[in-house]
Design a protein with these regions (language model features):
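Non-catalytic helical/linker scaffolds that mediate oligomerization, partner binding
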Residues: 1-472
Length: 472
């Protein structure tokens, strides 16, 4: 078996603590499969540099690395505070102004006119994932007076949630469209759409998105939960954005919804990412809390395709340690004797299609024959994704001639992808795969491989073949 093979993927956010080429390489070496670029804190120039550095590492180590850009969406954020931060005390009366910058040390700027038009007296204002809570006392044209209910240190650019205030927003802002165009030009692999409220939001993004770029629907609004089935059908993947979700919903409801969203993603055969505060204490600490370890482990046990690091890897003191810890937790869970049976018990009925039936049969056949690997030949990646949905015990070795497909699959559970442009027919593919598998000690002479593919090879979406070969 490949050294350090792990089925659950790690998505790390890139930022000041991890943007340099040598640091990116170290993070990949320690377990990162793909990188997230948070457009809320990144301009187009920085976005270009991040992508360039990641691709430089990818070329050097000859391993596909996925890139996901996370659009800000209609996210409300605090403007620029004087000296970048201010301390709010419980009971303190604060002034909020419709401005991009504060004019004094006690003023909170919110550069969003629609907030001042829509918010009402007694409405709550949550800031920084609910760490700070204000209650509105008075509203005028461009000024809000509020009382501090939950105190804390407020920093510039922190997110704002208004769970009782109705704002009419499109999930795709003008700034988002600019970042989408930049992402397409730079060749990113995934685009995460924030604050989705309905399937229409995904359709709007698809109209301007390149066909090679996959759409990740971020689930962080109660209205999205009301349409979760349709959103899961339309999107290419789901991200459980627990920060805003835990502010918009009662926080105690989030774990139950996490299970439900993972289940919906798996029903529809879409990769799902669990994100936000997974190893939060490791922003400054060299070790996580026991609760954080349990949180990551729970996401892995529930069958999440990927777990995500946010500030831990973007601005934290110890990005490498955070990645190493997440890697160790995932490995430990996957070695648990109950892991595979738990995932199998969670599997819903196989969708009624030939490709899905073949993917399911490949998993069963590999188990019956004690085959250590399932090989998928794919152009679009769909064969590998369908086999992944079954959560087989075996490695899923996906072979594709398209580097963009390999990058996309870095966020799909269990998939190890190799790019091979030389094969023009199935027999050549089998020969190449045998050689690679023996070289990497994935399989021994005399063992069997289960192969799935679509014939003819170059035709998309035609998974119609299952075959068993013996390695000689």
């Amino acid at each position: 078996m490949l050294k350090n093979y792990r089925k659950t993927k790690i998505l790390a956010t890139i930022g000041p603590s991890s943007e340099k080429i040598n640091k990116i390489e170290k993070l990949v070496h320690n377990g990162v499969d793909a990188f997230r670029i948070n457009c809320s804190h990144t301009n187009v120039h920085q976005l270009s540099n991040y992508v360039k550095n990641i691709r430089t590492v990818e070329k050097k180590i000859k391993k596909p690395i996925g890139i996901l850009i996370d659009l800000q969406g209609p996210k409300l954020r605090v403007g620029e505070i004087e000296n970048d931060s201010m301390v709010l005390k419980k009971g303190q009366i604060v002034v909020i102004k419709n401005s991009s910058k504060s004019s004094n040390k006690t003023e909170i700027p919110i550069p969003e006119e629609k907030v001042f038009k829509s918010i009402k007296v007694n409405h709550p204002i949550f800031i920084d994932d609910g760490k700070i809570k204000l209650k509105v006392l008075k509203v005028s044209k461009n000024i809000i007076q509020a009382r501090v209910v939950l105190e804390g240190k407020l920093r510039s650019k922190k997110g704002i949630n208004l769970p009782e205030t109705i704002l009419k927003n499109s999930a795709l802002t003008a700034s988002d469209k600019k970042n989408v165009r930049a992402g397409i030009k730079l060749g990113v692999d995934w685009i995460a759409l924030s604050f989705i409220q309905s399937p229409t939001d995904i359709k709007d993004l698809k109209k301007i998105c390149h066909k090679n770029i996959s759409i990740m629907a971020k689930i962080e609004k109660p209205s999205a939960l009301n349409h979760i089935d349709k959103i899961a059908k339309l999107a290419d993947g789901l991200m459980i954005a627990r920060g805003d979700l835990g502010v918009e919903l009662p926080i105690e409801d989030v774990p139950g919804w996490q299970k439900r969203i993972i289940r919906e993603a798996r029903i529809h055969g879409k990769p799902v990412i669990v994100s936000t505060q997974m190893l939060e204490s490791m922003i400054i600490s060299k070790t996580p809390t026991r609760a954080e370890v349990s949180d990551v482990a729970t996401a892995v046990f529930e069958g999440s395709d990927a777990v995500m690091l946010s500030a831990e890897s973007a601005v934290g003191d110890n990005p490498e340690l955070a990645v190493k810890m997440m890697n160790k937790i995932a490995h430990s869970v996957e070695k648990n004797p109950n892991y595979s049976s738990i995932l199998s018990a969670q599997l819903e009925k196989t969708p009624d299609s030939t490709p899905d039936a073949i993917a399911s049969a490949a998993g069963s056949l590999a188990t019956e024959l004690n085959a250590p690997v399932i090989v998928c030949y794919t152009e679009s990646g769909s064969t590998g994704i369908k086999v992944s949905r079954v959560r087989p015990r075996q490695m899923i070795l996906t072979v594709t001639p398209i580097i963009e497909t390999a990058r996309k699959l870095t966020l799909v559970w269990g998939v190890k992808c190799i790019v091979q442009k030389d094969a023009n027919n199935l027999e050549e593919m089998i020969k190449i795969t045998k050689a690679f598998s023996k070289k990497e000690k994935i399989i021994k002479v005399g063992e069997k491989m289960v192969i799935t593919a679509g014939l003819p090879l170059k035709k998309l979406g035609t998974t119609n073949l299952i075959r068993v070969i013996k390695v000689d």
